[in-house]
């Protein structure tokens, strides 16, 4: 299964590559700096570490939201989440924790950044199979007049060569990591661009059979 392949790939990946994560955060910042209400996530060990991005956006007075588990009795539900504003200190589980709920008015989200295992050719998310984002986002966005920008992120890109997802699975506008940005263009399937800053930093060699377009970071997100 594609999901199992992605999980095995995660186990083999170098989870401590801080340089790549910082490059990805820098690229994400260029995209998100014009948005005001942004839903991010609390990164797990296998996910792209976006903590530097969260703090940088807060320094720019952006309203950052994080998922907040819904408590059912003595336990937390695995079926969905609500959102809460990012605030310091976050001490319950150590250095980085879920935010606490507040009466802060939930404004309409402008942008949502979603961690993924992989995606298929319809630009829909393949996650861990719990369906938390698929259940939660429609409820959060139900009363919004405008659909927010949805950005998929991961350390390494994995794309299935066929459609594996369902119509209710999340579809993104963009995919981003330290190396590339892919735009979901329904007319041309997708466009892909390579981050020149990454090439300069790592001296990487790419497969040009996929018609990569080389460009600098500021031009990458046009």
Enumerate the predicted regions with their spans.
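Short glycine-rich anion-binding loops that position phosphate/pyrophosphate groups of nucleotides
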Residues: 44-46, 117-121
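Glycine-rich, N-terminal phosphate-binding loop of Rossmann-like dinucleotide-binding domains
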Residues: 42, 116, 179
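Residue-level signal for inorganic ion chemistry
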Residues: 6, 64, 113, 129, ...
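Surface-exposed, charge/polar-rich loops and edge strands
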Residues: 103, 107-112, 121-124, 135-222
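Charged helix-capping and loop-helix junction motifs
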Residues: 55, 128-134
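N-terminal active-site beta-alpha-beta segment that forms phosphate/nucleotide-binding
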Residues: 1-103, 107
């Amino acid at each position: 299964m594609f999901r199992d392949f992605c999980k095995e790939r995660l186990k083999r990946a170098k989870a401590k590559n801080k340089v790549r994560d910082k490059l990805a955060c820098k690229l994400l910042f260029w995209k998100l700096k014009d948005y005001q209400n942004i839903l991010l996530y609390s990164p797990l060990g296998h996910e792209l570490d976006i903590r530097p991005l969260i703090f940088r956006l807060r320094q720019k007075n952006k309203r950052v939201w994080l998922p907040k588990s819904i408590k059912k009795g003595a336990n937390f539900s695995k079926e969905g989440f609500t959102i809460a504003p990012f605030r310091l200190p976050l001490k319950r589980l150590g250095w980085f924790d879920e935010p606490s709920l507040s009466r802060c008015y939930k404004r309409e989200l402008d942008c949502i950044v979603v961690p993924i295992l992989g995606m298929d050719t319809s630009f829909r998310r393949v996650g861990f199979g719990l369906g938390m984002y698929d259940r939660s986002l429609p409820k959060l966005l139900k009363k919004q007049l405008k659909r927010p920008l949805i950005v998929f992120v991961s350390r390494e890109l994995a794309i299935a060569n066929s459609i594996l997802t369902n119509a209710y699975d999340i579809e993104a506008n963009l995919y981003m990591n330290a190396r590339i940005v892919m735009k979901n263009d329904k007319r041309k399937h997708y466009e892909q661009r390579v981050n020149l800053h990454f090439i300069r930093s790592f001296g990487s060699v790419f497969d040009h059979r996929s018609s990569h377009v080389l460009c600098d970071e500021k031009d990458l997100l046009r």
